[in-house]
Regions:
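Charge-rich, low-complexity N-terminal segments
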Residues: 1-142
Length: 142
């Protein structure tokens, strides 16, 4: 009998600040495009990473959430908590938004997928309870 495919998710919170600013634009254009978000401001972010796969009949799990928790702690919390995100090396030169953060975190966690036991299928970055970006990988938008 084929095992059911399930999705498991770990959620992590961190506090970070950023400024939405495109260095290729004038100060006036940045203010016009980004408004108040052109100034340094902060969010209590929530990041969710989801893995999907068949249920392992031996363990009763898709993957061990402890592994996902560890990778997320190392790639999200330890890298971003209480930081100005624009100064994080792997975000330099990027207009830091929930969208660009979701793609960057996808790349970092996907690179460690062999440690997770199941494929990464979604990253969600929430700036608030009412605003988030979700990324499902480069093939999802094709």
């Amino acid at each position: 009998m084929q095992q059911p495919v399930l999705t498991i998710t770990h959620r992590m919170e961190f506090a970070g600040a950023h400024r939405m600013d495109n260095p290729g634009l004038s100060a006036e254009r940045n203010q016009e495009v980004f408004g108040a978000c052109n100034r340094i401001h902060g969010h209590n972010y929530t990041v969710e990473a989801s893995l999907a796969g068949p249920l392992d009949p031996e363990t009763g799990m898709v993957a061990n959430l402890v592994d996902l928790m560890r990778v997320m702690r190392e790639e999200v919390f330890e890298q971003l908590d209480h930081r100005l995100l624009n100064e994080v090396e792997w975000l330099e030169g990027v207009v830091v938004s929930a969208e660009t953060l979701a793609v960057a975190l996808w790349d970092r966690i996907k690179a460690r997928e062999d440690e997770l036991g199941a494929p990464l299928v979604c990253i969600r970055v929430c700036e608030s309870a009412a605003a988030w970006a979700e990324y499902r990988g480069p093939a999802a938008g094709a």
